[in-house]
Protein backbone atom coordinates (compact mmCIF):
# COMPACT_ATOMS: atom_id res chain seq x y z
CA UNK A 1 0.00 0.00 0.00
CA UNK A 2 2.82 2.42 0.83
CA UNK A 3 4.46 1.71 -2.53
CA UNK A 4 1.21 2.46 -4.39
CA UNK A 5 0.73 5.68 -2.43
CA UNK A 6 4.31 6.76 -3.20
CA UNK A 7 3.81 6.17 -6.94
CA UNK A 8 0.60 8.21 -6.88
CA UNK A 9 2.30 11.10 -5.04
CA UNK A 10 5.11 11.14 -7.63
CA UNK A 11 2.55 11.35 -10.46
CA UNK A 12 0.64 14.20 -8.84
CA UNK A 13 3.87 16.08 -8.14
CA UNK A 14 4.92 15.84 -11.77
CA UNK A 15 1.55 17.18 -12.88
CA UNK A 16 1.80 20.11 -10.49
CA UNK A 17 5.30 21.10 -11.58
CA UNK A 18 4.61 21.38 -15.30
CA UNK A 19 2.02 24.18 -15.27
CA UNK A 20 4.68 26.70 -16.29
CA UNK A 21 5.40 25.05 -19.64
CA UNK A 22 4.31 26.73 -22.86
CA UNK A 23 0.99 25.99 -24.52
CA UNK A 24 1.79 26.53 -28.18
CA UNK A 25 4.66 25.40 -30.36
CA UNK A 26 5.85 23.88 -33.60
CA UNK A 27 4.86 20.37 -32.52
CA UNK A 28 1.09 20.84 -32.50
CA UNK A 29 0.70 17.53 -34.35
CA UNK A 30 1.46 15.87 -31.00
CA UNK A 31 -2.10 16.74 -29.96
CA UNK A 32 -3.70 15.30 -33.09
CA UNK A 33 -5.53 12.01 -32.76
CA UNK A 34 -5.68 9.30 -35.39
CA UNK A 35 -8.34 7.35 -33.48
CA UNK A 36 -11.82 7.37 -35.00
CA UNK A 37 -13.43 6.86 -31.60
CA UNK A 38 -11.48 9.67 -29.91
CA UNK A 39 -12.19 12.02 -32.84
CA UNK A 40 -15.93 11.32 -32.67
CA UNK A 41 -15.99 12.09 -28.93
CA UNK A 42 -14.30 15.49 -29.07
CA UNK A 43 -10.76 14.72 -30.23
CA UNK A 44 -8.84 15.05 -26.95
CA UNK A 45 -8.96 12.35 -24.26
CA UNK A 46 -11.42 9.65 -23.22
CA UNK A 47 -12.13 9.54 -19.47
CA UNK A 48 -13.74 6.12 -19.69
CA UNK A 49 -13.49 2.90 -17.71
CA UNK A 50 -9.91 1.62 -17.84
CA UNK A 51 -11.20 -1.95 -17.61
CA UNK A 52 -12.05 -1.88 -21.30
CA UNK A 53 -10.20 -3.33 -24.26
CA UNK A 54 -10.15 -0.26 -26.53
CA UNK A 55 -6.50 0.30 -27.39
CA UNK A 56 -7.46 3.45 -29.35
CA UNK A 57 -7.83 5.45 -26.15
CA UNK A 58 -4.33 4.61 -24.90
CA UNK A 59 -2.37 7.15 -26.96
CA UNK A 60 -4.18 10.15 -25.45
CA UNK A 61 -4.80 8.71 -21.96
CA UNK A 62 -2.16 6.15 -20.95
CA UNK A 63 -3.82 5.47 -17.59
CA UNK A 64 -6.39 3.44 -19.58
CA UNK A 65 -3.74 0.91 -20.64
CA UNK A 66 -4.51 -2.45 -19.04
CA UNK A 67 -3.99 -6.19 -19.42
CA UNK A 68 -7.13 -6.61 -21.55
CA UNK A 69 -5.20 -4.85 -24.36
CA UNK A 70 -2.63 -7.67 -24.52
CA UNK A 71 -1.96 -8.55 -28.21
CA UNK A 72 -4.50 -5.95 -29.38
CA UNK A 73 -3.67 -4.44 -32.77
CA UNK A 74 -5.10 -1.23 -34.18
CA UNK A 75 -4.70 0.44 -37.58
CA UNK A 76 -5.91 3.98 -38.25
CA UNK A 77 -6.12 6.24 -41.29
CA UNK A 78 -7.12 9.90 -41.43
CA UNK A 79 -8.15 11.62 -44.65
CA UNK A 80 -7.43 15.18 -43.53
CA UNK A 81 -7.50 18.04 -46.05
CA UNK A 82 -6.53 17.99 -49.73
CA UNK A 83 -3.46 15.73 -49.98
CA UNK A 84 -2.83 15.67 -46.22
CA UNK A 85 -3.24 12.31 -44.50
CA UNK A 86 -2.24 10.52 -41.31
CA UNK A 87 -1.76 6.90 -40.42
CA UNK A 88 -1.08 5.05 -37.18
CA UNK A 89 -0.51 1.54 -35.85
CA UNK A 90 -0.79 0.42 -32.21
CA UNK A 91 0.03 -2.84 -30.46
CA UNK A 92 -0.43 -3.86 -26.83
CA UNK A 93 1.57 -6.25 -24.65
CA UNK A 94 1.31 -7.08 -20.93
CA UNK A 95 4.10 -8.20 -18.62
CA UNK A 96 2.97 -9.62 -15.29
CA UNK A 97 5.36 -7.82 -12.95
CA UNK A 98 5.75 -4.41 -14.55
CA UNK A 99 2.41 -3.66 -16.18
CA UNK A 100 0.90 -3.27 -19.63
CA UNK A 101 2.44 -1.47 -22.61
CA UNK A 102 1.15 -0.03 -25.87
CA UNK A 103 3.55 0.83 -28.68
CA UNK A 104 2.40 3.10 -31.49
CA UNK A 105 3.71 4.93 -34.53
CA UNK A 106 1.87 7.84 -36.15
CA UNK A 107 2.94 9.35 -39.46
CA UNK A 108 1.69 12.52 -41.12
CA UNK A 109 2.10 13.23 -44.84
CA UNK A 110 1.41 16.82 -45.94
CA UNK A 111 2.10 16.21 -49.62
CA UNK A 112 4.61 17.56 -52.12
CA UNK A 113 5.26 21.21 -52.91
CA UNK A 114 6.98 23.02 -55.78
CA UNK A 115 9.94 25.25 -55.10
CA UNK A 116 9.38 28.89 -56.09
CA UNK A 117 11.76 31.79 -56.54
CA UNK A 118 11.42 35.17 -54.84
CA UNK A 119 8.99 36.38 -57.54
CA UNK A 120 6.65 33.42 -57.03
CA UNK A 121 7.60 31.58 -60.23
CA UNK A 122 7.45 27.82 -59.70
CA UNK A 123 10.47 25.65 -60.41
CA UNK A 124 10.36 22.09 -61.72
CA UNK A 125 11.64 20.50 -58.51
CA UNK A 126 9.53 19.57 -55.51
CA UNK A 127 9.95 18.89 -51.80
CA UNK A 128 7.90 17.00 -49.22
CA UNK A 129 6.65 17.78 -45.71
CA UNK A 130 6.03 15.11 -43.07
CA UNK A 131 6.12 14.39 -39.35
CA UNK A 132 6.01 11.34 -37.10
CA UNK A 133 5.52 10.29 -33.47
CA UNK A 134 6.90 7.10 -31.93
CA UNK A 135 5.20 6.35 -28.63
CA UNK A 136 5.67 3.79 -25.86
CA UNK A 137 2.85 3.87 -23.32
CA UNK A 138 2.69 2.14 -19.94
CA UNK A 139 -0.24 1.64 -17.59
CA UNK A 140 -0.88 -0.07 -14.28
CA UNK A 141 -3.69 -0.44 -11.75
CA UNK A 142 -2.89 0.62 -8.21
CA UNK A 143 -6.28 -0.62 -6.99
CA UNK A 144 -9.68 -1.59 -8.36
CA UNK A 145 -10.57 2.08 -8.61
CA UNK A 146 -7.30 3.81 -9.47
CA UNK A 147 -4.93 3.44 -12.42
CA UNK A 148 -1.95 5.43 -13.67
CA UNK A 149 -0.02 5.61 -16.91
CA UNK A 150 2.64 7.42 -18.90
CA UNK A 151 3.72 7.87 -22.51
CA UNK A 152 7.25 8.39 -23.80
CA UNK A 153 7.22 10.02 -27.23
CA UNK A 154 9.84 10.78 -29.85
CA UNK A 155 8.63 13.32 -32.40
CA UNK A 156 10.23 14.46 -35.63
CA UNK A 157 9.52 16.84 -38.51
CA UNK A 158 10.92 17.18 -42.00
CA UNK A 159 9.98 20.34 -43.88
CA UNK A 160 12.01 20.42 -47.09
CA UNK A 161 15.63 20.20 -45.83
CA UNK A 162 14.69 21.42 -42.36
CA UNK A 163 14.47 18.77 -39.65
CA UNK A 164 13.85 18.79 -35.93
CA UNK A 165 13.45 16.24 -33.13
CA UNK A 166 11.83 16.37 -29.71
CA UNK A 167 11.17 14.12 -26.74
CA UNK A 168 8.04 14.34 -24.61
CA UNK A 169 6.08 12.46 -22.02
CA UNK A 170 2.44 12.30 -20.96
CA UNK A 171 1.35 11.34 -17.45
CA UNK A 172 -2.17 10.39 -16.45
CA UNK A 173 -4.36 9.02 -13.68
CA UNK A 174 -7.89 7.61 -13.81
CA UNK A 175 -10.23 7.07 -10.87
CA UNK A 176 -13.60 5.27 -10.77
CA UNK A 177 -15.86 5.99 -7.81
CA UNK A 178 -18.59 3.80 -6.34
CA UNK A 179 -21.24 5.51 -8.48
CA UNK A 180 -19.41 4.53 -11.69
CA UNK A 181 -18.27 8.06 -12.41
CA UNK A 182 -14.89 7.96 -14.17
CA UNK A 183 -12.40 10.82 -13.73
CA UNK A 184 -9.14 11.26 -15.66
CA UNK A 185 -6.39 13.85 -15.26
CA UNK A 186 -3.83 14.02 -18.06
CA UNK A 187 -0.74 16.20 -18.57
CA UNK A 188 0.44 16.06 -22.18
CA UNK A 189 3.68 16.90 -23.97
CA UNK A 190 6.03 17.53 -21.06
CA UNK A 191 9.45 17.77 -22.68
CA UNK A 192 11.61 19.77 -25.04
CA UNK A 193 13.07 19.91 -28.50
CA UNK A 194 16.36 18.06 -28.81
CA UNK A 195 17.64 19.59 -32.03
CA UNK A 196 16.80 21.46 -35.21
CA UNK A 197 18.92 22.56 -38.15
CA UNK A 198 17.16 25.79 -39.16
CA UNK A 199 17.28 28.19 -36.19
CA UNK A 200 19.38 28.96 -33.12
CA UNK A 201 16.56 28.62 -30.57
CA UNK A 202 14.47 25.66 -29.47
CA UNK A 203 10.79 25.33 -30.32
CA UNK A 204 8.34 24.87 -27.46
CA UNK A 205 6.13 21.82 -27.16
CA UNK A 206 2.32 22.28 -26.97
CA UNK A 207 1.91 21.38 -23.29
CA UNK A 208 -1.64 21.02 -22.01
CA UNK A 209 -3.53 19.60 -19.05
CA UNK A 210 -6.97 18.05 -19.30
CA UNK A 211 -9.55 16.93 -16.79
CA UNK A 212 -12.25 14.55 -17.96
CA UNK A 213 -15.27 12.81 -16.47
CA UNK A 214 -17.77 10.28 -17.78
CA UNK A 215 -20.89 8.58 -16.50
CA UNK A 216 -22.66 5.56 -17.94
CA UNK A 217 -26.36 5.63 -17.17
CA UNK A 218 -27.69 2.79 -15.07
CA UNK A 219 -30.80 1.91 -17.09
CA UNK A 220 -29.71 3.12 -20.53
CA UNK A 221 -26.59 2.09 -22.52
CA UNK A 222 -25.56 5.73 -22.86
CA UNK A 223 -22.31 7.26 -21.62
CA UNK A 224 -21.93 11.02 -21.18
CA UNK A 225 -18.40 12.44 -21.47
CA UNK A 226 -17.16 15.84 -20.30
CA UNK A 227 -13.63 17.19 -20.86
CA UNK A 228 -12.16 20.45 -19.57
CA UNK A 229 -9.20 21.25 -21.84
CA UNK A 230 -6.25 23.59 -21.19
CA UNK A 231 -6.31 23.64 -17.41
CA UNK A 232 -3.03 25.54 -17.49
CA UNK A 233 -4.47 28.58 -19.31
CA UNK A 234 -7.72 30.36 -18.51
CA UNK A 235 -7.99 33.06 -21.19
CA UNK A 236 -8.63 31.44 -24.58
CA UNK A 237 -10.55 34.32 -26.18
CA UNK A 238 -9.09 35.63 -29.43
CA UNK A 239 -10.05 39.09 -30.69
CA UNK A 240 -10.06 38.95 -34.49
CA UNK A 241 -8.26 42.04 -35.92
CA UNK A 242 -10.37 41.70 -39.09
CA UNK A 243 -13.50 42.12 -36.95
CA UNK A 244 -15.49 39.57 -38.93
CA UNK A 245 -17.96 39.25 -36.06
CA UNK A 246 -18.51 43.03 -35.70
CA UNK A 247 -16.93 43.31 -32.26
CA UNK A 248 -15.67 46.86 -32.89
CA UNK A 249 -17.76 50.03 -32.91
CA UNK A 250 -17.78 51.27 -36.56
CA UNK A 251 -17.96 54.91 -35.44
CA UNK A 252 -15.21 55.02 -32.81
CA UNK A 253 -13.15 51.97 -33.78
CA UNK A 254 -13.05 50.83 -30.17
CA UNK A 255 -13.71 47.29 -29.00
CA UNK A 256 -17.24 46.77 -27.74
CA UNK A 257 -17.03 45.96 -24.07
CA UNK A 258 -18.55 42.67 -22.96
CA UNK A 259 -19.91 42.14 -19.50
CA UNK A 260 -17.79 40.20 -17.05
CA UNK A 261 -20.39 37.44 -17.04
CA UNK A 262 -20.26 37.15 -20.85
CA UNK A 263 -16.45 37.03 -20.84
CA UNK A 264 -16.40 34.44 -18.06
CA UNK A 265 -18.99 32.24 -19.79
CA UNK A 266 -17.23 32.50 -23.15
CA UNK A 267 -13.88 31.54 -21.64
CA UNK A 268 -15.35 28.71 -19.58
CA UNK A 269 -17.13 27.06 -22.49
CA UNK A 270 -14.08 27.40 -24.77
CA UNK A 271 -12.48 24.84 -22.44
CA UNK A 272 -15.44 22.46 -22.49
CA UNK A 273 -16.01 19.42 -24.68
CA UNK A 274 -19.16 17.33 -24.31
CA UNK A 275 -19.87 13.99 -25.96
CA UNK A 276 -22.09 10.95 -25.80
CA UNK A 277 -21.74 7.29 -26.73
CA UNK A 278 -24.80 5.06 -27.23
CA UNK A 279 -24.46 1.27 -27.40
CA UNK A 280 -27.18 -0.29 -29.57
CA UNK A 281 -26.61 -3.93 -28.68
CA UNK A 282 -23.24 -5.65 -28.72
CA UNK A 283 -22.27 -4.79 -32.28
CA UNK A 284 -23.23 -1.16 -32.90
CA UNK A 285 -22.19 2.09 -31.21
CA UNK A 286 -23.23 5.66 -32.11
CA UNK A 287 -21.15 8.65 -31.03
CA UNK A 288 -21.43 12.44 -31.11
CA UNK A 289 -19.33 15.26 -29.66
CA UNK A 290 -19.28 19.05 -29.47
CA UNK A 291 -16.23 21.28 -29.03
CA UNK A 292 -17.31 24.88 -28.34
CA UNK A 293 -13.75 26.22 -28.44
CA UNK A 294 -13.11 24.72 -31.87
CA UNK A 295 -16.36 26.20 -33.14
CA UNK A 296 -15.50 29.70 -31.89
CA UNK A 297 -12.01 29.54 -33.41
CA UNK A 298 -12.92 28.08 -36.82
CA UNK A 299 -16.45 29.28 -37.54
CA UNK A 300 -17.21 31.63 -40.43
CA UNK A 301 -19.55 34.51 -39.48
CA UNK A 302 -21.27 34.31 -42.88
CA UNK A 303 -21.84 30.55 -42.85
CA UNK A 304 -21.67 28.79 -39.52
CA UNK A 305 -22.47 25.21 -40.50
CA UNK A 306 -21.78 22.34 -38.08
CA UNK A 307 -18.25 23.44 -37.15
CA UNK A 308 -17.32 22.07 -33.73
CA UNK A 309 -19.46 18.95 -33.98
CA UNK A 310 -18.13 15.43 -34.47
CA UNK A 311 -19.89 12.14 -34.93
CA UNK A 312 -19.14 8.53 -35.65
CA UNK A 313 -20.17 4.90 -35.58
CA UNK A 314 -18.55 1.68 -34.42
CA UNK A 315 -19.45 -1.86 -35.51
CA UNK A 316 -18.20 -5.31 -34.57
CA UNK A 317 -17.74 -7.64 -37.53
CA UNK A 318 -16.42 -11.15 -36.90
CA UNK A 319 -13.24 -10.57 -34.84
CA UNK A 320 -12.78 -6.95 -35.86
CA UNK A 321 -14.04 -3.62 -34.54
CA UNK A 322 -14.42 -0.95 -37.21
CA UNK A 323 -14.84 2.68 -36.18
CA UNK A 324 -15.57 5.60 -38.48
CA UNK A 325 -15.96 9.27 -37.60
CA UNK A 326 -16.02 12.74 -39.08
CA UNK A 327 -14.96 15.93 -37.33
CA UNK A 328 -16.48 19.17 -38.61
CA UNK A 329 -13.48 21.48 -38.33
CA UNK A 330 -14.31 23.96 -41.10
CA UNK A 331 -17.09 24.69 -43.58
CA UNK A 332 -14.70 23.99 -46.48
CA UNK A 333 -13.79 20.48 -45.41
CA UNK A 334 -13.69 18.01 -42.56
CA UNK A 335 -11.37 15.09 -41.78
CA UNK A 336 -12.56 11.50 -42.02
CA UNK A 337 -11.22 8.91 -39.57
CA UNK A 338 -11.28 5.13 -39.81
CA UNK A 339 -9.82 2.67 -37.31
CA UNK A 340 -9.78 -1.13 -37.41
CA UNK A 341 -8.98 -3.02 -34.21
CA UNK A 342 -8.59 -6.70 -33.41
CA UNK A 343 -6.91 -9.00 -30.90
CA UNK A 344 -4.37 -11.43 -32.30
CA UNK A 345 -5.11 -13.98 -29.57
CA UNK A 346 -8.63 -14.35 -30.94
CA UNK A 347 -7.20 -16.02 -34.05
CA UNK A 348 -5.52 -18.82 -32.09
CA UNK A 349 -7.13 -22.24 -32.35
What are the functions of these language-model segments?
Residues 4-15:
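Sec-dependent N-terminal signal peptides
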Residues 16-20:
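Sec/Tat signal peptide C-region and signal peptidase I cleavage site
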Residues 1-5, 144:
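Positively charged n-region of N-terminal signal peptides that target proteins for export
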Residues 21-349:
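Subset of outer-membrane beta-barrel
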